[in-house]
Curated annotation (Swiss-Prot):
Keywords: Cytoplasm, DNA damage, DNA excision, DNA repair, Excision nuclease, SOS response. The gene is uvrC. One of its GO terms (molecular function) is excinuclease ABC activity. GO terms for cellular component: cytoplasm; excinuclease repair complex. One of its GO terms (biological process) is nucleotide-excision repair. The lineage of its organism: Bacteria, Pseudomonadati, Pseudomonadota, Gammaproteobacteria, Enterobacterales. It holds the Pfam family UvrC_RNaseH_dom. This is UvrABC system protein C. Residues 204-239 form the UVR domain.
């Protein structure tokens, strides 16, 4: 127990009402957030002589201050707890690393509805289908729907400004409602209804209606129409045959858990309208000494309740672990959803099979993750030995990319003890230097990255400079001039130069810009981690450079036209669907864009044609 914190005096002031407590260390950092039905009883349990676990002992030893927020109900306490966890990210709480909202397929409520991927709040008028496990699953489904039910997927700005059909119409993936006379209102509405039924899991109704239409077309001797509908029927059947189908109407999230070597994997299986939409594995950050029950309970609460990114709730949640707060969780979710949400921990029949599947997937994903982490750990340990460091907890690497000196981009990638930390990758647009001057680019990015206050935990142990002696000299010069509150001598600056043939395994490493470097054997684990982070940095820089180059390519022609500033350029590209669409547009079409006069439209048309 902390000698500074007076637990007895504090507990005398605590109420027995429900609420949330926040524990702080000597530095004023929130180290733990918890909730309680009875705050006094719960907080008293931390200051007994026989604590429940080593984790609790370590936590209590660091407490210097506790804040308490009283709530009206346990449900309020549960919601507030998870909002605080998301806000403070306390190191003694189990933390859900990936808190992105799940994507949905959106069917708009326009006169001619469109299909699109959607994340976040559902403000737009229309229908939402999902959730899907990731953006790839949505894009794959949209591509499939476009082949079977050719309704539009273009933005409204593009749709409203077309006078002739686009390429999607030419290849049969859109009915072309943007141009009058290409498709009847009835036919388009019918295809939209098929999409609605299909995404709602009512495949049989889609097939029944299509078969009836095909037979009628045959009777009317409209054989081309009958053949088109026949192809549509076959496409729907091919898709439905591949899908794993559960009981019709099942609307479930199935959560399986695996726990080993201090690491947890939570696998979530999404079933909507009786179909498995997909699944996803999570690896929450687990403080040492945490029990599996706490991992499951905290994960489920964070997964469904945290902040504005609240998940779409299914009718039922299946778990393979008993929760002490199961009733409270179900009541809280039901209150949020405005309907009854069931939390089931002992399912039978098909539901038990789903749970077994989720548990198996969790175990498999955890084995893979542990294997990868073991490899990364071995490589970082080997590199630390080569560099004579006690350990490497964080490593950063920089690379520069440009084309003939133009659109220069610098990348910074970050590795921690578990490997790539992609959420902390950064790109820097480099400006104000002589084109092609990589040294100046490196100088600029290092000053921008390190010439400011940095949290203790984010100071790298190793900074890898791709480019050899010259770039390393720039890095040394920058660090010599830094005037910062953190220890600028802590990071080890390491230069890496590719061999004469630029082949992997022939790299030379430099501690200093002067003198000879040294090489590592091609099979060295230390070399492998250097190659890994350098390749990540190179790919990240190239990706950023390509995006920047593409952006410039799309706007450079317009930038030369007098009277077309940034806002008008953006409006033109948006309404015409890109530079190619603008090149193909007539003067009359260009003049329809907001803010573009007839005279300016003629000038734009002439400039693009010549």
């Amino acid at each position: 127990m902390s000698e500074i914190f007076d637990a007895k005096a504090f507990l005398k002031t605590v109420t027995s009402q429900p609420g949330v407590y926040r524990m702080y260390d000597a530095g004023g950092t929130v180290i733990y957030v918890g909730k309680a039905k009875d705050l006094k009883k719960r907080l008293s349990s931390y200051f007994r002589s026989n604590l429940a676990s080593r984790k609790t002992e370590a936590l209590v030893a660091q407490i210097q201050h506790i804040d308490v927020t009283v709530t009206h109900t346990e449900t309020e306490a549960l919601l507030l707890e998870h909002n605080y966890i998301k806000l403070y990210q306390p190191r003694y709480n189990v933390l859900l690393r990936d808190d992105k909202s799940y994507p949905f397929i959106f069917l708009s409520g326009d006169t001619h509805p469109r299909l699109a991927m959607h994340r976040g709040a559902k403000h737009a008028k229309g229908e939402y289908f999902g959730p899907f496990p990731n953006g790839y699953a949505v894009r794959e489904t949209l591509a499939l729907l476009q082949k079977i039910f050719p309704i539009r997927q273009c933005e409204n700005s593009v749709y409203r400004n077309r006078s002739r059909p686009c390429l999607q119409y030419q290849i049969g993936r859109c009915l072309g409602p943007c141009v009058a006379g290409l498709v009847s209102e009835e036919e388009y509405a019918q295809q939209v209804e098929y999409v609605r039924l299909f995404l709602s899991g009512k495949d049989d109704q889609v097939l029944t209606q299509l078969i009836a239409r095909m037979e009628k077309a045959s009777q009317d001797l409209a054989f081309e129409e009958a053949a088109r509908i026949r192809d549509q029927i076959q496409a729907v059947r091919r898709v439905t045959e591949k899908q794993f189908v559960s009981n019709a109407g099942d609307d479930l999230d199935v959560i399986g858990v695996a726990f080993d070597a201090g690491m947890a994997c939570v696998h979530v299986l999404f079933i909507r309208q009786g179909k498995v939409l997909g699944s996803r594995s999570y690896f929450p950050k687990v403080p040492g000494g945490t029990e599996l029950g706490e991992v499951v309970e905290t994960f489920v609460g964070q997964f469904y309740l945290q902040g504005s990114q609240m998940r779409t709730l299914p009718g039922e949640i299946l778990l393979d672990f008993n929760l002490s707060d199961k009733t409270l969780l179900a009541d809280s979710l039901s209150e949020l959803a405005g309907r009854r949400i069931h939390v089931q921990t002992k399912p039978r029949g098909d539901r038990a099979r789903y749970l077994k599947l989720a548990r198996t997937n969790a175990a498999t994903a955890l084995i893979t993750k542990l294997s990868q982490q073991s490899t990364i750990t071995q490589r970082l340990t080997a590199l630390a030995a080569v560099l004579k460091l006690p350990a490497i907890k964080r490593m950063e690497c920089f690379d520069i990319s440009h084309t003939m000196g133009e659109q220069t981009v610098a990348s910074c990638v970050v590795f921690d003890a578990n490997g790539p930390l992609r959420a902390e990758y950064r790109r820097y647009n480099i400006a104000g230097i002589t084109p092609g001057d990589d040294y100046a680019a490196m100088n600029q990015v290092l000053r921008r990255r390190y010439g400011k206050a940095i949290e203790e935990s984010k100071i790298p142990d190793v900074i890898l400079i791709d480019g050899g002696k010259g770039q390393l000299a720039q890095a040394k010069a920058v660090f010599a001039e830094l005037d910062v509150p953190w220890d600028k001598h802590r990071p080890l600056l390491l230069g890496v130069a590719k061999g004469a043939d630029r082949k992997a395994g022939l790299e030379t490493l430099f501690f200093e810009p002067e003198g000879e470097g040294f090489s590592l054997p091609p099979d060295s684990p230390a070399l492998h981690v250097i190659q890994h982070i350098r390749d990540e940095s190179h790919d990240h820089a190239i990706g950023g450079h390509r995006k920047k180059r593409a952006k410039v390519k799309n706007t450079s022609t317009l930038e030369t036209i007098e009277g077309v500033g940034p806002k008008r350029r953006q409006m033109l590209l948006k309404y015409m669907g890109g530079l190619q669409g603008l090149r193909n547009a007539s003067v009359e079409e260009i003049a329809k864009v907001p803010g573009i006069s007839q005279g300016l439209a003629e000038k734009i048309f002439w400039s693009l044609k010549h």
